[in-house]
């Protein structure tokens, strides 16, 4: 195996970056020879199963060893990296050890990087920004390529009205938020809105799906105490970590997906919810204003406002309206935000880097 592109995922915990790599690998392996380095992902396993002739797992040392030489056609091998340590490694290989490689980096941050990441990014051969705003902070952006998701993996259930029954939780309908349990993800804002709304809407139960690290155990405990004081412990439920293979089931289960972080570089949760037929309420950060078609697929509200979040969610607690918006959301994702479209944009960047 002599991969054209080496894709890295050198972080142990599953994150938003991991999620984008996970979605892309099976699609990219259809047309590219890929070597995958780092923490395993379901998408990597699928890519190897479906395209064993074009996909291989590599250790870091194996990837370094094969990168000493050019590809058989004389082209340099591309390393596609997404994190600072990965940029540092590849710059060392290319500029110090003089390996014949090219480096592509994906940037999603919607703020000016500090001096060291700026320097690292300036050394890239190609830079992909996920939004025009992210590109405005990276002068050497090669192309803007929005993230996309798999319509096969994220799909609506046969009956959104009755699917909640399979959860065994109270009520007829679900409202879900997906992400790590910590302040920057706005989980306290979500809980505030649910405490305000759920007593008025007995048919609804809220779920919070995501990892809580020991650092934020106290934060979750405070939220649980607030929920208990409101008498809602059975109707605002912490699910904990949801396996990447089954997270789509929970998007199917809920009628409304809420994404209310205080800051997000891009944010996949509204896309994943919309693809599963959910109406969406999102805070005004990340790419959410681009993703959500206001009033048609959901609503975007000011960041850090539980009151505004509750107002928007209240409008969607009409199941008929929420289902209609969810259908439009699925159509919007299919038209603009598929992983196939993202993979095509990335392939175009690879091609331009090889031509330089």
Language-model features, listed with the residues they occupy:
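Nucleotide-activated donor-binding/catalytic signature segment of Leloir-type glycosyltransferases, i.e.
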Residues: 220-241
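Short alpha-helical donor nucleotide-sugar binding micro-motif in glycosyltransferases
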Residues: 241-242, 249-254
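Short hydrophobic beta-strand element within catalytic cores of glycosyltransferases
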Residues: 279-283
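Donor nucleotide-sugar binding/catalytic pocket of nucleotide-sugar-dependent glycosyltransferases
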Residues: 121-160, 169-170
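Conserved acidic donor-binding segment of nucleotide-sugar-dependent glycosyltransferases
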Residues: 294-295, 299-306, 314-320
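A short, well-ordered alpha-helix in the C-terminal region of glycosyltransferases
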Residues: 321-336, 342-345
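Aromatic "clamp/platform" in nucleotide-sugar-dependent glycosyltransferases that forms part
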Residues: 262
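Conserved donor-binding/catalytic core segment of Leloir-type glycosyltransferases
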Residues: 166-185, 191-195, 207
């Amino acid at each position: 195996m002599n991969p054209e592109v080496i894709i890295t995922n050198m972080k142990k915990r599953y994150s938003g970056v991991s999620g984008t790599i996970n979605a892309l690998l099976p699609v990219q392996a259809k047309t590219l020879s890929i070597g995958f380095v780092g923490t395993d992902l379901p998408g990597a396993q699928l890519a190897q199963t479906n395209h064993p002739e074009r996909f291989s797992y590599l250790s870091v040392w194996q990837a370094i060893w094969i990168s000493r030489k050019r590809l058989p056609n004389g082209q340099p091998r591309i390393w596609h990296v997404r994190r600072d340590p990965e940029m540092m490694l590849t710059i060392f290989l290319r500029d110090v050890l003089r390996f014949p490689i090219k480096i592509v980096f994906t940037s999603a941050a919607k703020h000016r990087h500090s001096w060291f990441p700026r320097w690292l990014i300036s050394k890239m051969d190609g830079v992909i920004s996920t939004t025009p705003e992210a590109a405005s902070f990276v002068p050497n952006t090669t192309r803007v390529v929005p993230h996309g998701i798999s319509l096969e993996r994220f799909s609506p259930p046969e009956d959104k009205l009755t699917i909640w029954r399979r959860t065994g939780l109270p009520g007829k309908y679900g409202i879900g938020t997906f992400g790590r349990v910590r302040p920057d993800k706005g989980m306290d804002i979500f809980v505030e809105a649910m405490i305000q709304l759920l007593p008025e809407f007995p048919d609804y139960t809220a779920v919070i799906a995501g990892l809580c690290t020991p650092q934020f155990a106290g934060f979750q405990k405070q939220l649980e105490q607030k929920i208990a004081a409101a008498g809602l412990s059975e109707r605002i439920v912490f699910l904990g970590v949801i396996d990447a293979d089954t997270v789509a089931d929970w998007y199917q289960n809920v009628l409304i997906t809420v994404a209310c972080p205080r800051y997000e570089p891009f944010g996949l949760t509204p896309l994943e919810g919309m693809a599963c037929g959910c109406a969406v309420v999102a805070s005004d950060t990340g790419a959410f204003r681009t993703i959500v078609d206001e009033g048609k697929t959901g609503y975007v509200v000011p960041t850090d406002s539980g009151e505004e979040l509750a107002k928007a969610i209240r409008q969607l607690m009409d199941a008929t309206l929420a289902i209609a918006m969810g259908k439009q959301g699925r159509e919007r994702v299919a038209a603009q935000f598929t992983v196939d479209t993202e993979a095509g944009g990335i392939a175009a960047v690879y091609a331009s880097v090889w031509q330089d």
